[in-house]
């Protein structure tokens, strides 16, 4: 059974190439793996066929959103590689992502830069002569 032949001995190309559920849904994230995690995670007795597709698409969207913002943060810092600090800056500067991931600690992410108003130098109204 080598050479990509099935039980009948006919090549897979002749039968028609099998499409994964991810490719059918137009996703990059693995729908089959998400389905397996849902089944093995004891979240419910039964898992619908569209639930893993929906969850995989949500995970893919959130990942793309975070990576886009982190890429912008890396570019702002004149870096070509995204590091945990860029992820931290991207998430904490976005209101909705910060609310979603508010209790999440990112290792090596650092803290958000902030200087209290009272610590800033006072601006005088008169110009120095």
Swiss-Prot record:
The record marks 122 as: Not ubiquitinated. GO terms for cellular component: nucleosome; nucleus. CDD domains: HFD_H2A. It is found in: Nucleus; Chromosome. The modification N5-methylglutamine is found at residue 108. PROSITE patterns: HISTONE_H2A. The keyword DNA-binding applies. In contrast to vertebrates and insects, its C-terminus is not monoubiquitinated. Belongs to the histone H2A family. PANTHER family: HISTONE H2A. The nucleosome is a histone octamer containing two molecules each of H2A, H2B, H3 and H4 assembled in one H3-H4 heterotetramer and two H2A-H2B heterodimers. The octamer wraps approximately 147 bp of DNA. This is Histone H2A.2. The gene is HTA2.
């Amino acid at each position: 059974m080598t050479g990509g032949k099935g039980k009948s001995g006919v090549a897979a190309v002749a039968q028609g190439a099998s499409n994964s559920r991810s490719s059918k849904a137009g996703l990059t994230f693995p729908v089959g793996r998400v389905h397996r995690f849902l089944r093995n995670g004891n979240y419910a007795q039964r898992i619908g066929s569209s639930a893993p597709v929906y969850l995989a698409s949500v995970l893919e969207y959130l990942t793309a959103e975070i990576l886009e913002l982190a890429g912008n943060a890396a570019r702002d810092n004149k870096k070509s590689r995204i590091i945990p600090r860029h992820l931290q800056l991207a998430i904490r500067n976005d209101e909705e992502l910060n609310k979603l991931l508010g209790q999440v600690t990112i290792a090596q992410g650092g803290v958000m830069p902030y200087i209290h108003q009272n610590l800033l130098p006072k601006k005088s109204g008169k110009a120095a002569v």
